[in-house]
């Protein structure tokens, strides 16, 4: 049984990479982790790891593109827990690295569905539960591809999706600032030793990269009740919390 004092934390894309590291770090902090990912087997492995830490998890095998399932998730979590303390919007896909003029509409729509629309549907479904928490926290994982001073060619669908995600998170931060205790943050992990990074940069030596676990150690405090800032971006490569600046 989940302790009444345990933080209830939902992590999307929780079965591997950054999501897995965040889920395990939250479990170490005593949170009951609601782990959402597509693959049941990988979720079962995560559950075993969380139990080995003495923690508890609820497994949600779900495709982020299944918007009806995301809509139902809020009701299911409310029935079981009555609130949600932490939402970590981590799940995402890279999509093809291709010139914008050559991007296939199906690929474009899939990237936008998972990286953008799914996070809006989660906010829509889970906002009442975050408001029911005494210290609701939302953390969305972005990318440096979204806000480079000079955009990188061929990353169009992914970069556009992450820029849209940043706008969603900042809008949600503005809308909750004076109406709730919710705090909303973005985090840019930078280059990490993940499967997505290997797909994007196949010639790169992964041993030169930092790990998802190192990032999680820095990112999880953004989900704590003690964290009181909102609408800002934590940049892991520079280890700084940044404001968004208006164009010059």
Would you name each region that the model predicts?
Residues 15-17:
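Conserved glycine-rich cofactor-binding loop
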Residues 6-7, 55-56, 83-84, 130-143, ...:
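Active-site loop of short-chain dehydrogenase/reductase
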Residues 41, 61-72, 105:
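The beta1-alpha1 cofactor-binding region of Rossmann-like NAD(H)/NADP(H)-dependent oxidoreductases
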Residues 29-45:
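Conserved glycine-rich Rossmann-like NAD(P)H-binding loop of the short-chain dehydrogenase/reductase
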Residues 98-100, 107-110:
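Substrate-binding pocket helix/loop in short-chain dehydrogenase/reductase
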Residues 178, 182, 186-187, 194, ...:
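C-terminal helical subdomain
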Residues 93, 131, 137-178:
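Catalytic loop of short-chain dehydrogenase/reductase
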